[in-house]
Amino acid sequence: MPGGKKVAGGGSSGATPTSAAATAPSGVRRLETSEGTSAQRDEEPEEEGEEDLRDGGVPFFVNRGGLPVDEATWERMWKHVAKIHPDGEKVAQRIRGATDLPKIPIPSVPTFQPSTPVPERLEAVQRYIRELQYNHTGTQFFEIKKSRPLTGLMDLAKEMTKEALPIKCLEAVILGIYLTNSMPTLERFPISFKTYFSGNYFRHIVLGVNFAGRYGALGMSRREDLMYKPPAFRTLSELVLDFEAAYGRCWHVLKKVKLGQSVSHDPHSVEQIEWKHSVLDVERLGRDDFRKELERHARDMRLKIGKGTGPPSPTKDRKKDVSSPQRAQSSPHRRNSRSERRPSGDKKTSEPKAMPDLNGYQIRV
């Protein structure tokens, strides 16, 4: 996975440890602090795809055997459900022993008329993601390797629409990319969050979007204000700070934000998604610098698209699009440089659009 620029600078928040910048072999700019090894140890397991195989201190599993789920994975899932659910084994036995479980309807993949406005399309995409429901089992059904080329991830997203199984946040990001490939005027980029609550770290990811200069997000969460945001935020910093406020309402403290680069609209692209172009340490940066770095990242994305190295409007027709829900034009542009990395900030909060409550029984997000 390509490295990005990590920003963990001083800022204005109280006493900050003395630090000196050092360049890691991967090209990620690291800051060595007096906390030294503990700070670096905290960095190593940060992989949103599997959340370090822990979700707020609670282990969770990934189905690596594909579908249909093999018996060993199936039994492990139910054993884990019995362990983490408040009703323990009773709930697993009640579901597995039932003979009259209702048939779950399969949501329809959204389709659009050419005249349908992009904001309405985004609402439909989010509604579809929401209808798949959040996966509370503790076993992620689709294995997502973030280093896979985009074309492989789009094939996986297509499989998600066929299976219509509950998903977690990273799966929702891949699905969101797939379902918006036919919207060339919509910029898409990953936004990852690391928060702290009650002695544990939690990780979450959404798909940031930018349409007509307004920012929003698509995603999946146990909490309605940590996924969908309509494209109504004037700046990237407003969007991120709105997520931070949502975290604050469930007593989570935002620790880090990772911002990726714009994702190509070409479902057949062999390039990888750039997940961590900017890594921002919220505490060390301080409020003003945090906003500045967020806005710098937004400028980087605009400049990259302006230079023709990002995903602009598609220019080439494809007769058959096997990895997109609709037949659409696809972008042949490839990003030329993965080493041009800088992060981006500004503040204001906007009312998020109300979504149905996911009503999780845990405070994990």
From Swiss-Prot:
Composition bias type Basic and acidic residues, residue spans: 337-351
Reported effect, residue 134 to A/F: Abolished tyrosine carboxypeptidase activity on alpha-tubulin
Pfam family, one: Vasohibin
Places the protein is found: Cytoplasm; Secreted
Site feature (Cleavage) residues: 29-30, 76-77
Gene Ontology molecular-function annotations: actin binding; metallocarboxypeptidase activity; tubulin-tyrosine carboxypeptidase
Family: Belongs to the transglutaminase-like superfamily. Vasohibin family.
Name of protein: Tubulinyl-Tyr carboxypeptidase 1
Organism: Homo sapiens
